[in-house]
Amino acid sequence: MRIARRKYGCILHHMSWILVGLGNPDKEYDGTRHNVGRDFVAHFKDKLSKKPKVLDLNVYMNNSGGPIKKAVPTKKAAQQLIVVHDELDLPLWRVKISFGSSAGGHNGIKSIEKALKTKDYVRVRVGISPSTPSGKLKRPDAEKITDFVLGKFKASEQEKLKKARKVVGEALELILTEGKERAMTEINSK
């Protein structure tokens, strides 16, 4: 734990951040939609101005909770956890930061919530679904979701993927330097 002094003279006590990107560890999953969180964290972990503790999970996404629980043993510590993951309910390139929200249908997030017994941690949700030219979400049909999330990004999606990576970098910097509330205000309005 460290102590930081703010310009208003109050002393803040806080623990350092823990950063994890969800994904599957095998090489065959590199570059897939489901591994976008893991891939983005690998890209940024050495580039951030403040260095969080980065957890490089060597388990499949749906079993992420156990290893994270070892690094985040209390509900209070969970508030300093940042999880970057794919999000079917957002169009590709869209990034949203949430805190204390439900897993929806994301099994990796469900595993974390079950292990930590809390939803109170930061999620950086990276949209992976296609959208119409007007920006309306085109979520894949239920029976096609597994193939979709385990599929690689198309060449035509690379520009939007670069945009998402840039926004995730901005989100992580804001969380680490100015806090989750400021990051949510800034990033969620994009």
Language model regions located:
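Nucleotide and nucleotide-moiety/phosphate-recognizing core
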Residues: 2-3, 8-100, 110-125, 131-147, ...
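Conserved TIR/SEFIR loop-to-helix hotspot centered on a Trp-containing motif
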Residues: 103
